[in-house]
């Protein structure tokens, strides 16, 4: 496939190595299918044709030129420039280089056309051709002046005599990237024409010129390349992707080489070839119907068509007839259905074909109603689309100057690669946006209004290359707002435009859209009139759209783009849309854009100059940072009443009305100071509470560092949060984002930030598909006061918006808008999106105020509960109150929750006395149930611990256990509550517990939980309360000391009891030391007796061990080798007085050799070794061997 591309007036014929149907020709045979390089260099510099297997594209980072290829020195710098132009990411490899046809679809789609949305209509994906173009080697720019005389480079010449001519004459990319070049072709200037004048007629001013401007023609070249290799190409029509008849191909090409370009024979051949493939999908191929006939003259100022062109297109003289002819091929309704709209005579440009692409836009002439937000709405009515371009009340060029200047003033600092802008300059010269591709005004398809989008939108905010998705039909969400603003600003003279001028301007839009010409980054003033006129026609269509909707007329469908950026910066793409269905409809930001004061003043001055009338700043599309919008402006009724420029307005406005908001307020009604639309308009009541101020107040950063995120830094306090508002989600991470009463474009810094700020959106903006992780803006309740910005917090305010309007919550066409995190955003795990993101560490610096509305959910989550606990410890009283207000009503639910109970406990620890008492009131009536519950018992314990005991609520809580003491004592949870009651409550209030223990002391002492309660009673109760308990204990001492639980009660008495109680227990032990010491549980009691008994009682117990005999051995020997009793012997050695200790050691000496055989005997020897070494005594024969075996 040979394709010709003009790059900044340089011509190159190159062979696509990705085309599998090409064959390799022998060296020396010059054929148009081979790469022919034209040069003005010396004759004789013969370069052999490069075979297809080695025609690697030189621009790719992994491609390298081979010997004799087109590569030259300085290629790496040009590669960097090409990468800069086309945003190729590092590491992206050109797929299929040198591999024949196997390389298709191996690389990322960089210039997708959207054709792959309709797979059944796809002939050849434009992505592949665009990818090939992107990989084209841009090695040089010098072509000489050989094309300036009008010579066609595709004509036959004797180039084989002079050898190949190379255009790669060295590196000439030294000047500014988008700067002035030598005689390049720029965007043709589109100006208004007199009626009946064709586009191809050259006249003084009213003609289409292609002058030698000072701006690059890169965009023209790109579209030339894309369209020349479109599916309408005869090569593809005949060969598609399959193998071709090589011989026939060669004969065909050689035959064509000997003919003139526009000869009638060739034109006939082209038509025959086109007819053979036009119906490849059962649909006529309109775009590129004569693909080989070049429609654009490369010679500056030469736009005359040849006779063949006139013969080909001369029959189309009436614009409406031509449009009907094109649209009816798609099965559209005849134009007679819209008889109410006058049909003007429109002459189509014979240079460029106008028509829809049936490969992509195969839509039926009907609307598809849907009743859910997830379903797409078929909103492009291609049958009545022409009517939008035949409205008589078009706008003039000058009326869009104000909106353009305001938009450029706001986004000037965002053009990072354009050096002419600075922070404080007013927008004097307009620089069109880089590569705005087919953004669509209302009522048109995305292919037909790329220029209109550029005129109304201004510089692009977020490059579509960042997301790697198809950019066709993608536009920022404030496109509607800007169009409506421009329409209202120019509405005072819209009705005064004559019909011929309107039709001329609309022709221009249609013509430009049909040719699919993307805008290049540096079109100069010559393209400004084009932008202005195109914008005027776009706003005219918006007016017609608004009028039709307000009047309820049929045939005015709503706009549903295939993809666009919503107000949060999220790219909404409906990839699953079927034929006839557009994308999901999302609400756009309704209010004005905040700009700096200097830029606002410049914009106001420009608006006043363009509108020739009073221009107010209050209701304009832009507002100053330090200005407040007035409460309302009366709109007097006039004789010339037009429909409101609002898209969804039903109010009647004077021609001098200053309101240019998206949602205009009704006449004479006061507006809302915090919103851009009135509360009494068609959508005011509903959207006031549903939408709120979904604004993005980007901080006015003054830093000039080139960091990737410096456009969202928080170095300014202009947007400091007021006391009545709450910081939105993500404020801690993007701390430069705050509240604003009027939303603006996401990611667009203010002009004072300078050109160094990055256009790259935050990383989280593309991580969740159609919704981002950043909640920008606040929520208002309809009166201008901010309410909680947390997800779900708007639910209780939605009841106020019950009006049955288009955007009401009950509407099936447009679901009501909600915040980024709503209570209905439930993830598959059952958690809300906010909690899920928090659990995934997406909010490392989340604050309590940012989860308002989700406190209950967080409290019942493991990580969320821990987060709240940690925050409550250091929270301010206001933050604690915020949390407390949400948990109070459901306090009992949290008290019995596995994680929520900890939040309640934290309030008992760190909350105010009022909060503690309020929670205690929630416990009242549920003490027993909570005491027996695993988690509720902990809450009651905290309440008993931290509420002052003199509070009446404590006594009331404890009294609820009366009659259920034993049940609670024997319960694994309730016993802790009873213990805490005994510890914290005044003993006088616990008499009912003592009374309940009567005759139950032994049973409770041997109970695993009751024994603990008995010990607490012995520790904290009054002596008169513990006496009956001790009496019962003494009666069962012998049994209790051997019980696995009762022994703890006896030990507790020995440790904390009165001396007389200890003596009673020691008396029970004497005489049974040997037996009890060998008992697993009683041995512990014997140890406590030796430790806590008096000196006399201790000596008696030790003497009993030393003098008692156990059969042939002494009791001491038996105890030393016993697994339990040896600890009693060790304790005796430790606590015995020196004289008695010496006696014990002399008793142990005869058994040293034997004790070494026993595991437990070694413990005794180690104890002896310790004392003898400590005291320096010589053990004599008692000592072990020198190696110190222990």
Curated annotation (Swiss-Prot):
Phosphorylated. Phosphorylation takes place at the time of dissociation of cpeb1-a from pum1 and the translational activation of ccnb1 mRNA. GO terms for molecular function: mRNA 3'-UTR binding. GO terms for cellular component: cytoplasm; cytosol; P-body. It holds the Pfam family PUF. Residues 38-74, 491-531, 611-675, 744-777 are annotated as: Disordered. PROSITE patterns: PUM, PUM_HD. Pumilio repeats lie at residues 850-885, 886-921, 922-959, 960-995, 996-1031, 1032-1067, 1068-1103, 1107-1146. Residues 901-905, 1047-1051, 1126-1130 are annotated as: Uracil-nucleotide binding in RNA target. It is found in: Cytoplasm; Cytoplasm, P-body; Cytoplasmic granule. CDD domains: Pumilio (cd07920). SMART domains: Pumilio (SM00025). Interacts with cpeb1-a; interacts with unphosphorylated cpeb1-a but not phosphorylated. Component of a complex with papd4, sympk, tacc3, parn, dazl and cpeb1. This is Pumilio homolog 1. The lineage of its organism: Eukaryota, Metazoa, Chordata, Craniata, Vertebrata. The gene is pum1.
């Amino acid at each position: 496939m040979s394709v010709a591309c003009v790059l900044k007036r340089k011509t190159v014929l190159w062979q696509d190595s990705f085309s599998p149907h090409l064959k390799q020709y022998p060296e020396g045979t010059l054929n148009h299918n081979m790469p022919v390089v034209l040069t003005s260099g010396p004759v004789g510099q013969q370069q052999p044709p490069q075979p297809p297997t080695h025609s690697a594209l030189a621009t790719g980072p992994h491609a390298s030129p081979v010997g004799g290829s087109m590569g030259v020195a300085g290629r790496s710098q040009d590669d960097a420039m090409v990468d800069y132009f086309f945003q190729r990411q590092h590491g992206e490899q050109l797929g299929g280089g040198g591999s024949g046809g196997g390389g298709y679809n191996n690389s990322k789609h960089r210039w997708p056309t959207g054709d792959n949305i309709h797979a059944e209509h796809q002939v050849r994906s434009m992505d592949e051709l665009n990818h090939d173009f992107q990989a084209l080697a841009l090695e040089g720019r010098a072509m000489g002046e050989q094309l300036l005389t009008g010579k066609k480079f595709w004509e036959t010449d004797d180039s084989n005599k002079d050898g190949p001519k190379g255009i790669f004459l060295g590196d000439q990319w030294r000047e500014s990237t988008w700067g002035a070049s030598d005689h390049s072709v720029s965007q043709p200037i589109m100006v208004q024409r007199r009626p009946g004048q064709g586009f191809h007629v050259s006249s003084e001013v009213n003609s289409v010129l292609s002058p030698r401007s000072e701006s690059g023609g890169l965009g023209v070249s790109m579209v030339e390349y894309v369209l020349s290799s479109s599916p309408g190409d005869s090569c593809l029509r005949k060969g598609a992707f399959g193998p071709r008849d090589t011989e026939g191909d060669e004969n065909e090409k050689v035959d064509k080489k000997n003919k003139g370009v526009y000869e009638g024979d060739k034109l006939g051949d082209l038509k025959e070839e086109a007819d053979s493939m036009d119906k490849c999908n059962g649909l006529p191929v309109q775009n590129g119907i004569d693909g080989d006939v070049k429609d654009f003259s490369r010679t500056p100022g030469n736009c005359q068509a040849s006779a063949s062109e006139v013969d080909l297109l001369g029959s189309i003289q009436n614009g409406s007839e031509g449009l009907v002819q094109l649209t009816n091929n798609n099965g559209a309704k005849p134009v007679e259905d819209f008889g109410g709209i006058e049909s003007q005579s429109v002459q189509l440009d014979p240079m460029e074909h106008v028509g829809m692409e049936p490969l992509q836009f195969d839509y039926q002439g009907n609307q598809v109603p849907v009743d859910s937000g997830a379903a797409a709405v078929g909103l492009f009515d291609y049958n009545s689309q022409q009517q939008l371009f035949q409205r008589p009340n078009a706008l003039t060029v000058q009326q869009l100057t104000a909106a353009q200047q305001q938009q450029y003033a706001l986004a000037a600092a965002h053009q990072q690669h354009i050096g002419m802008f600075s922070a404080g300059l007013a927008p004097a010269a307009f620089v069109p946006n880089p590569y705005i591709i087919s953004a669509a005004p209302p009522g048109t398809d995305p292919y037909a209004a790329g220029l209109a989008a550029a005129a109304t939108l201004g510089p692009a905010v977020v490059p579509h290359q960042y997301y790697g998705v198809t950019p066709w039909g993608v536009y920022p969400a404030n496109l509607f707002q800007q169009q409506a603003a421009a329409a209202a600003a120019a509405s005072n003279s819209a009705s005064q435009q004559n019909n011929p001028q309107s039709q001329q301007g609309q022709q221009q839009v249609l013509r430009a859209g049909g040719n699919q010409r993307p805008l290049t980054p540096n079109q100069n003033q010559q393209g400004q009139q084009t932008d202005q006129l195109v914008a005027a026609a776009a706003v005219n269509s918006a007016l017609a759209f608004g009028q039709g909707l307000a009047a309820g007329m049929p045939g005015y469908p709503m706009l549903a783009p295939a993809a666009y950026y919503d107000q949060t910066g999220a790219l909404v793409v409906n990839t699953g849309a079927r034929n006839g269905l557009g994308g999901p409809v999302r609400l756009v930001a309704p209010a004005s854009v905040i700009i700096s004061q200097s830029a606002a003043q410049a914009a106001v001055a420009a608006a006043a100059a363009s509108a020739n009338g009073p221009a107010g700043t209050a209701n304009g599309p832009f507002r100053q940072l330090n200005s407040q919008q007035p409460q309302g402006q009366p709109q007097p009724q006039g004789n010339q009443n037009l429909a409101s420029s609002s898209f969804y307005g039903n109010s009647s406005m004077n021609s001098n009305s200053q309101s240019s908001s998206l949602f205009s307020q009704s006449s004479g009604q006061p507006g809302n100071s915090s919103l851009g639309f009135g509360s009494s308009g068609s959508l005011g009541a509903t959207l006031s509470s549903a939408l709120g101020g979904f604004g993005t107040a980007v901080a006015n950063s003054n830093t000039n560092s080139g960091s990737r995120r410096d456009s969202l830094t928080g170095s300014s306090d202009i947007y400091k949060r007021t006391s009545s508002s709450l910081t939105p989600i993500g404020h801690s991470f993007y701390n430069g984002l705050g509240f604003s009463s009027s939303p603006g474009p996401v990611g667009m810094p203010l002009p004072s930030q300078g050109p160094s700020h990055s256009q790259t959106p935050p990383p989280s903006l593309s991580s969740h598909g159609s919704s981002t992780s950043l909640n920008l803006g606040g929520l208002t309740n309809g009166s201008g006061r901010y309410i909680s910005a947390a997800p779900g917090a708007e639910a209780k305010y939605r009841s106020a918006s019950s009006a049955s309007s288009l955007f009401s919550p009950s509407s099936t066409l447009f679901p009501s808008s909600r915040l980024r995190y709503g209570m209905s955003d439930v993830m598959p795990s059952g958690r809300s999106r906010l909690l899920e993101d928090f659990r995934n560490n997406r909010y490392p610096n989340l604050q309590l105020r940012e989860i308002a509305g989700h406190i209950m959910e967080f409290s019942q989550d493991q990580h969320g509960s821990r987060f709240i606990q940690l925050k409550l410890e250091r929270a301010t009283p206001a933050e604690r109150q915020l949390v407390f207000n949400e948990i109070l009503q459901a306090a009992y639910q949290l008290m019995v929750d596995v994680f929520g109970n900890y939040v309640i406990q934290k309030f008992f620890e760190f909350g105010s006395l009022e909060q503690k008492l309020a929670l205690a009131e929630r416990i009242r009536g549920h003490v027993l149930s909570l005491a027996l519950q695993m988690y509720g018992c902990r809450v009651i314990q905290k309440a008993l611990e931290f509420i002052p005991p003199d509070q009446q609520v404590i006594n009331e809580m404890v009294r609820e256990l009366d009659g259920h003491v034993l049940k609670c004592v024997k319960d694994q949870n309730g016993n802790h509550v009873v213990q805490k009651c005994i510890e914290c409550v005044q003993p006088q209030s616990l008499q009912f517990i003592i009374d309940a223990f009567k005759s139950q002391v032994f049973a409770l002492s041997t109970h695993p939980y009751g024994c603990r309660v008995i010990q607490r009673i012995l520790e904290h109760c009054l002596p008169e309360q513990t006496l009956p308990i001790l009496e019962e204990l003494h009666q069962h001492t012998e049994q209790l000391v051997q019980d696995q639980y009762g022994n703890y009660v006896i030990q507790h008495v020995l440790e904390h009891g009165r001396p007389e109680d200890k003596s009673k227990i020691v008396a029970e032990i004497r005489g049974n030391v040997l037996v009890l010491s060998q008992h697993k549980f009683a041995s512990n009691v014997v140890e406590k007796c030796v430790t806590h008994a008096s000196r006399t009682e201790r000596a008696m117990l030790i003497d009993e061990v030393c003098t008692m005999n156990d059969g042939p051995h002494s009791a001491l020997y038996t105890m030393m080798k016993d697994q339990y009793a040896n600890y009693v012997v060790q304790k005796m050695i430790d606590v015995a007085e020196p004289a008695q200790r010496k006696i014990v050691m002399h008793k142990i000496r005869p058994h040293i050799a034997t004790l070494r055989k026993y595991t437990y005997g070694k413990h005794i020897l180690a104890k002896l070794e310790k004392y003898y070494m400590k005291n320096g005594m010589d053990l004599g024969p008692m000592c072990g061997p020198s190696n110190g075996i222990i």
